[in-house]
Amino acid sequence: GKQPREHQLRAMSAAHAYFQDHDRGKLIMACGTGKTYTALKIAEDLLNNKGLVLFMVPSISLLGQSLNAWCADAVNPIKGICICSDSRASRKIKKDFDDTQDSIVDLAVPATTNPKSIAKQLKLYRNHNGLTVVFSTYQSIEAIHAAQHEILKETAGTYGKFDLIVCDEAHRTT
């Protein structure tokens, strides 16, 4: 499989050391240097290839790319859950050129914004021996919050907390 390049190994090592004492951090890398891959390798390292990860992105096209990349490059098979409003994306007005491609994205797993459906998928993957990754657009954060609230309530707080949250293109968040 794919092997990390030198600059990615340095980033992974720095992240490993940094997260021993911190619970938040930034990974800043130039375009085309493999941030998505590096984030996956950091997640696998920090969580010993097992845990619940939230991967946030600004657009559905980026969600599809990230999902495909993580599933292709993961050490152990990933259980992916996609949270986005496909219907809203496909009705996007073409003038919104920033995310024009959203309407033609084919996601590898069905997408939803229904909190009950999200909670059901999370429960289904609870004992998965690998990473369970919730891939979501920022605009769907409320659906994740509602699903997480439901699962934490059902499991008396024993399941549903994210072990790691990755915010891609975080500089675009408000």
Q: How would you name each of these model-derived features?
A:
Residues 1-33, 37-51, 68-72, 92-113, ...:
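ATP-dependent helicase/translocase motor core
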Residues 13, 64, 143:
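Alpha-helical elements of the RecA-like P-loop NTPase motor core of helicases
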Residues 46-48, 74-75, 125-128, 156-159:
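Conserved catalytic network of the ASCE P-loop NTPase/AAA+ motor domain
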Residues 51-59:
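Conserved RecA-like ASCE P-loop NTPase motor core of nucleic-acid helicases/translocases
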Residues 52, 130-133, 161-164:
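Loop/turn-to-beta-strand initiation segments
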Residues 117-123:
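Conserved helicase ATPase core of P-loop NTP-dependent helicases/translocases
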Residues 128-146:
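Conserved two-lobed SF2 helicase motor
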Residues 138-141, 153-174:
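SF2 helicase catalytic motif II
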